[in-house]
Amino acid sequence: GFVATRNWAEGAYPSECWYNLEGDDVLGILSTRNPEETILWSGDKDLKQIPGLHLDNEGNTYSISDLEADVYFYRQVLTGDTTDGYPGCPGIGPKTAEKLIPEQDFTEASAWGTVIKQYEKKGFGPDYALTQARLARILRNTEYTFDELQLWTPLTIPSTPPTTPSTKE
């Protein structure tokens, strides 16, 4: 089972155990810490927000650029991920998110502005959008130092007051 396999792997290969972090965060941190020495292999689509070299299940490698990773992250903030337990912005699926956050002319400031605007259209404020972004975010090397997490923060935070979801019917 799992425990026997883990014990074998820890004995056969250099290994570490990181407490209080999810496995995908550890992968994101390690991959962005040593991008020349790391290949990510995972069935978790969320890891598309991590730049670097990836391996698919057929054994093919492909590269995800910083731009592609950042675009994927902002789209994920809009679509949410029910498997990971955050809903995203109501009514926005992958195709809509792709139209709202295009790769062409992408900037983080414009992407974040789009995210805020979409959440506000649904009656949510910037604080709620920020919570969704932090739930979507897979940590990168610059966002974690030993036992110290730096919560993701957008480059610009709008100065509008926080709002709560409307109760219109």
Write out the residue ranges for each language-model feature:
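Extended two-metal-dependent nuclease catalytic cores across DNA- and RNA-processing enzymes
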Residues: 1-168
